[in-house]
Amino acid sequence: DIQMTQSPSTLSASVGDRVTITCRASQSINTWLAWYQQKPGKAPKLLMYKASSLESGVPSRFIGSGSGTEFTLTISSLQPDDFATYYCQQYNSDSKMFGQGTKVEVKGTVAAPSVFIFPPSDEQLKSGTASVVCLLNNFYPREAKVQWKVDNALQSGNSQESVTEQDSKDSTYSLSSTLTLSKADYEKHKVYACEVTHQGLSSPVTKSFNRGEC
């Protein structure tokens, strides 16, 4: 199969900026390349085909170029409607592989997260499961690291993260990390803590609670 590699994976920009996304094919695909734009909850929209041909109705600020193995999509002057995820797709072979996507996000100012920790509810514990939630609110940029510690022992493999779409008003993100344990495991330990590292924090922030005291 022909593999498609896009870069960068995220691009932070402001309205009016000129931005360029690169797509590389693992072998020559001539000009059999399409570009798509996708917004959350919507189907992908075709922007460009045959590497540089604009789909009908697509604004001329979108410019495609390249052939063989290297291609670019340039937006000459970024508009508010252009903040979305962009994908390249080769259609030289039957596999019609897509690139992994490039998210064009609003360039914000660095903002540290507000961090909260929530123990499992009594209702949930009755069902035999315990979920501890660490919530990070209103931060930028999107990269944030959450580490769970139970009685000071680092946890791995038993938590899941979910990040919101970028807030249209203040350009920030929010994130929830959920540590899931059995009720029996939960009741074997006392101190539950989440440690958060982010560019906006001069040092990691830890929020914790003692089981049975909250």
From Swiss-Prot:
Keywords of this entry: Adaptive immunity, Cell membrane, Disulfide bond, Immunity, Immunoglobulin, Immunoglobulin domain, Membrane, Repeat, Secreted
Cysteine pairs bridged by disulfides in the record: C23-C88, C134-C194
Subcellular location: Secreted; Cell membrane
SUPFAM superfamilies hit by this protein: Immunoglobulin (SSF48726)
Gene3D superfamilies per record: Immunoglobulins
Primary location: secreted
Residue intervals of the Ig-like domain: 2-99, 113-210
Pfam families: C1-set, V-set
Segments for region (Variable (V) domain, involved in antigen recognition): 1-108
One cellular component (GO) term of this entry: extracellular region
Keyword Disulfide bond annotated: yes
GO biological process: adaptive immune response
The keyword Lyase is assigned to this record: no
Stretches for region Constant (C) domain: 109-214
InterPro entries per record: Ig-like_dom (IPR007110), Ig-like_dom_sf (IPR036179), Ig-like_fold (IPR013783), Ig/MHC_CS (IPR003006), Ig_C1-set (IPR003597), Ig_sub (IPR003599), Ig_V-set (IPR013106), IgV_Light_Chain (IPR050150)
Biological role stated in the UniProt entry: Immunoglobulins, also known as antibodies, are membrane-bound or secreted glycoproteins produced by B lymphocytes. In the recognition phase of humoral immunity, the membrane-bound immunoglobulins serve as receptors which, upon binding of a specific antigen, trigger the clonal expansion and differentiation of B lymphocytes into immunoglobulins-secreting plasma cells. Secreted immunoglobulins mediate the effector phase of humoral immunity, which results in the elimination of bound antigens.
Assembly: Immunoglobulins are composed of two identical heavy chains and two identical light chains; disulfide-linked.
Official protein name in the record: Immunoglobulin kappa light chain
